[in-house]
Amino acid sequence: MAKQILYHESARRALEKGMDILAEAVAVTLGPKGRNVVLEKKFGAPQIVNDGVTIAKEIELEDHIENTGVALIRQAASKTNDVAGDGTTTATVLAYAMVKEGMRNVAAGANPMAIKRGIDRATQKVVETIAAHAKPVEDSRAITQVASISAGNDDEVGKMIADAIEKVGKEGVISLEEGKSTTTELEITEGMRFDKGYISPYFVTDPERMEVIQKDAMFLITDKKITLVQDLVPILEQVARARKPLFIIAEDIEKEALATLVVNKLRGNLNVSAVKAPGFGDRRKAMMQDIAVLTNTQVISEQTGLRLDSIKLDVLGKARQVNITKDYTTVIAEGNEEGVSARCEQIRRQIEETDSAYEKEKLQERLAKLAGGVAVIKVGAATETEMKDKKLRLEDAINATKAAVEEGIVPGGGTTLAHLAIELENWVQSNLEHEELIGGMIVARSLTAPLKRIVENAGQNGAVIAEQVKDKPFNIGYNAANAQFVDMFEAGIVDPAKVTRSGLQNAASIAGMVLTTECIVVDKAESQQKAASVNRNSFDY
């Protein structure tokens, strides 16, 4: 395919144009008075969302060069989502502000490499300062506040997530399910999560989120490698007749057997998924036994005299729901309370008897996984469109809460970054020089961008409010919901330090890359290629 090549300023301007389109589409959702965005879907009803990364993933432009700009800024949102699970809109707004500010200086003749070094050093300074200002999360009130803000100022949801964390612990698993009613409910159930994802992406049932979701699934657990497809055929036929999903945990599944499972899945003959067994050695056997107790099943093993090719359906266990991503598996069990409590008691005795600190730690980890259970939030809504939006908000709230527990909280609503802008300006002028100083000042000027946008979305003058916030003490910020200056901690307007930090780091990384771009090579648009071929063929020989 023919390529189009752009150099220097025109290359950077084309990237900026694409970034402008995406940043504006995402920025309208920021803050308590942020608006929604409607996404057209090829199939089904349009989706109404308020989630930055979901909007960013949907935007695809006709112009290949502008689309490259979109892809770059989308990366800032995606990476922030991967690290912190929230703060994607803030990351996008920051990245665009830094690029816009930096473009002016590069166009005026500043050295982009020196500017990038200045941006990196200034960002590192802000990250350290955020960590110094972060307050640890010690009570459920703080957890409620963080969750409420991330769920779009929904206090009920915040309280529900705080309850869930209180019941399953800070390391516990919180799962989202589609409810049957219009109200959102919390339920604590037996279940566990382990660090193994699907063996093949062909098992995925939700391509948008790259997840496998199986409801009312049958469980097959074996401690051997499944090499021959003949071993699986008898049980697969029985499961197909029962018309139930099948979930397999095995030491490994070799190519031939895996190919058979994938083909049957793709043809719709069988709803099947498989993961490798977690852990290794004796720990692997113990963990498989834990899962077997949880799902009321038997481990198919030579030691117990059970063979894969001769088992019946009554040997298989059951789970209410299985969620599998590329990294981990969550099992929500169907209630084998007696078996689970007996197994927990057994593990407790082992903890008392062992002298090894490592062994003790691993046994406690197993006990926490088995006894902690899973908090299931059943999302209720009147329509499917509302349900999807609610699920995205809840997901953000859960991620933000876990991030807050990890690294503490700071004043929210763009306040922290706005206050740190003054501190950073002073540090930059004392510690950086020449074009590195310009890079540092780019970061300092961009730090107020999220606050300005939150205020503008609420219908006020962003620049004026940002200057007023800078003059006030660190905890004082602007509450855009009621247009008042308040103590952000007292008002419950807080952000997880991890979200603020990772958003800034990813924004600075993308801005540095864009500013140091000198050439773009992209595919030529089809219309241009056709025009070129018409011109070539129009000579009069």
UniProtKB/Swiss-Prot annotation:
One of its GO terms (cellular component) is cyanelle. Keywords: ATP-binding, Chaperone, Cyanelle, Isomerase, Nucleotide-binding, Plastid. It catalyses: ATP + H2O + a folded polypeptide = ADP + phosphate + an unfolded polypeptide. GO terms for biological process: protein refolding. The keyword Cell membrane does not apply. It is an enzyme of class 5 (isomerase). Transmembrane segments: none annotated. Its EC number is 5.6.1.7. InterPro entries: Chaperonin_Cpn60_CS, Cpn60/GroEL, Cpn60/GroEL/TCP-1, GroEL-like_apical_dom_sf, GROEL-like_equatorial_sf, TCP-1-like_intermed_sf. The keyword Manganese does not apply. It is found in: Plastid, Cyanelle. It comes from the Eukaryota. ATP binds at residues 29-32, 86-90, 413, 479-481, 495. Pfam families: Cpn60_TCP1. GO terms for molecular function: ATP binding; ATP-dependent protein folding chaperone; isomerase activity; unfolded protein binding. Together with its co-chaperonin GroES, plays an essential role in assisting protein folding. The GroEL-GroES system forms a nano-cage that allows encapsulation of the non-native substrate proteins and provides a physical environment optimized to promote and accelerate protein folding. Belongs to the chaperonin (HSP60) family. Forms a cylinder of 14 subunits composed of two heptameric rings stacked back-to-back. Interacts with the co-chaperonin GroES. NCBIfam families: GroEL, PRK00013.1, PRK12849.1, PRK12850.1, PRK12851.1. HAMAP family: CH60 (MF_00600). This is Chaperonin GroEL, cyanelle. It comes from Cyanophora paradoxa.
